[in-house]
Regions:
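Rossmann-like dinucleotide-binding cores of NAD(P)H-dependent redox enzymes
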Residues: 1-42, 151-159
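Short, hinge-like loop/turn segments at secondary-structure boundaries
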Residues: 19-23, 53, 82
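A general beta-strand register signal
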Residues: 36, 50-51, 161, 194
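Short acidic-glycine loop/turn motifs at beta-strand connectors
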Residues: 45, 53, 194-198
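FAD-site-proximal beta/loop scaffold in flavoenzymes
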Residues: 48-50, 56-134
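Mid-to-C-terminal Rossmann-like scaffold of FAD/NAD(P)H-dependent oxidoreductases
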Residues: 107-208
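A short, polar/charged loop-to-alpha-helix boundary motif
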Residues: 208-224
């Protein structure tokens, strides 16, 4: 027996949106999972937990997913912008340093012109590799006495396998409104996420091979860019 509690109204609400999140919830419920959503745990006991509404749940094992917090404490006092990570420019150079310094991975908050000029941290599996490559190019240019050039337009991506469902995502779905473009919410489908008429994310449910076509549509001047 498994019970899930979370503050959001639907599971995976931020990366998937309400409709697809509700579909995932129904799929888990069909496999016997119980949900208590819209609230958190207020008290732990030897044999379970108590929720905000007073519900007490018995449990042999409690697993807490606390998320991630940028570890920037050691950088305090350096006049850097440490609001939600380390602020960098598009080429991964840390903003506010007297000498060239780069930051990469989940800690770096940088603008991605594929979407807009707002600096964001991206906690997706492929970004540490992509930002590391870009930072290496930046440092290589600087060490060679040249100014780094070029737009850095990484494509965020994640996947999740749950029971017989395979989720694959490209772009930043959390920034857009979900639109079902193929299939059904409750089954295999492809969902685009639109902002001001522009595709900024896509999620496929058991449609990984079909996503390549939609992936090319994501972001500013997306076709032909990678």
């Amino acid at each position: 027996e498994v019970t899930v509690t979370a503050y959001d109204a639907e599971p995976m609400l931020r990366p998937l949106g309400p409709e697809l999140g509700a579909a995932m919830k129904a799929h888990h419920e069909a496999h016997g999972v119980t949900f208590h959503l819209g609230q958190g745990v207020t008290e732990f006991h030897e044999d379970g937990v108590t929720l905000a509404d007073g519900t007490r749940l018995a449990a042999d094992v409690v697993i807490e997913a606390v998320g991630s917090v940028p570890n920037v404490e050691w950088l305090h006092g350096n006049d850097l912008n440490l609001e939600d990570g380390v602020l960098t420019d598009n080429l991964m150079r840390v903003v506010g340093t007297d000498v060239p310094v780069v930051a990469v991975g989940d800690i770096a908050r940088f603008p991605n012109p594929r979407f807009d000029d707002v600096p964001r941290r991206i906690e997706h599996w492929n970004l540490p590799t992509e930002t590391g490559k870009r930072a290496g190019q930046t440092l290589g240019a600087l060490l060679g006495g040249e100014e780094p050039t070029g737009d850095f337009r990484p494509m965020p991506a994640f996947w999740s396998d749950q029971y017989d469902i395979s989720l694959q995502s490209y772009g930043q779905p959390s920034l857009g409104m979900p639109t079902l473009v193929d299939g059904e919410w409750s089954g295999d489908c492809i969902v685009e996420y639109l902002r001001d008429g522009e595709v900024i994310g896509v999620v496929g449910v058991n449609r990984t091979k079909d996503l390549m076509h939609y992936r090319k549509e994501i972001g500013h001047e997306a076709v032909g860019s990678a």
